[in-house]
Amino acid sequence: MNVLANTLKGLYDVSGVEVGQHFYWQIGGFQVHGQVLITSWVVIAILLGSAAIAVRDPQTIPTGGQNFFEYVLEFIRDVSKTQIGEEYGPWVPFIGTLFLFIFVSNWSGALLPWKIIQLPHGELAAPTNDINTTVALALLTSVAYFYAGITKKGLSYFGKYIQPTPILLPINILEDFTKPLSLSFRLFGNILADELVVVVLVSLVPLVVPIPVMFLGLFTSGIQALIFATLAAAYIGESMEGHH
């Protein structure tokens, strides 16, 4: 009976969570999504702070934090070169920023105690747990690959829409709309589902049981960051080379 009572209580607690509640800032005539900005600033501060500490005294033979960040940079370079080709150099900062921001954002949802910070409405969570963030990242990626294609080929870039035959014009146009949609909803859906599963399990069972799920969530969060960055690089490479 106690188990049943605890289970029902957990379900009641979960049902009481506010869904769709947000904390807004009123700036002029606009409503600004305060939750996403706060958590995004925290993630940016973590990235900038850790990088500044790691490379504040660079050594010829790297050690410690400098060695770790150089390894991360090499990894991002490899991903960029594989997907973009020999002209990958200028795009390493963009791909690296996407990967690191998404990676730290995803992990912050599991590792940082956002819940202890009380807001008038809603609650804090990972930035990528909000569709506004993932859509913004996907739109930035779209702008990037259009810019890459137009910079490389000029207006002839738009000739891709009638290749290999003009009959495919509607499909080729639709493809450019589905790319940001798939990027944003894939990332948002995976992170949201992971956090919801952990919340439900923590409410229903003892703390030790959800721990394996939390570790699995950390793994999948890293994979999602890699997938997003890899696809962004692939789209940029595709726009520059003109192949599908």
Swiss-Prot record:
Protein's UniProt name: ATP synthase subunit a, chloroplastic
Under the heading HAMAP family, the entry gives: ATP_synth_a_bact (MF_01393)
Topology in the membrane?
Multi-pass membrane protein
Function summary? Key component of the proton channel; it plays a direct role in the translocation of protons across the membrane.
Please tell me whether the keyword Transmembrane is annotated for this protein. yes
Q: Which Gene3D superfamilies match?
A: ATP synthase, F0 complex, subunit A (1.20.120.220)
Which keywords appear in this protein's UniProt record, sorted alphabetically? ATP synthesis, CF(0), Chloroplast, Hydrogen ion transport, Ion transport, Membrane, Plastid, Thylakoid, Transmembrane, Transmembrane helix, Transport
GO CC annotations, alphabetized: chloroplast thylakoid membrane; plasma membrane; proton-transporting ATP synthase complex
**Locations listed in the record:** Plastid, Chloroplast thylakoid membrane
Q: Which PROSITE patterns match?
A: ATPASE_A (PS00449)
Task: Give the family from UniProt.
Answer: Belongs to the ATPase A chain family.
Tell me one GO molecular function of this protein. proton-transporting ATP synthase activity, rotational mechanism
Membrane-crossing ranges are: 35-55, 92-112, 131-151, 196-216, 217-237
According to the record's subunit comment, the protein's assembly and interactions are: F-type ATPases have 2 components, CF(1) - the catalytic core - and CF(0) - the membrane proton channel. CF(1) has five subunits: alpha(3), beta(3), gamma(1), delta(1), epsilon(1). CF(0) has four main subunits: a, b, b' and c.
| Cross-referenced InterPro entries | ATP_syn_F0_a_bact/chloroplast, ATP_synth_F0_asu, ATP_synth_F0_asu_AS, F0_ATP_A_sf
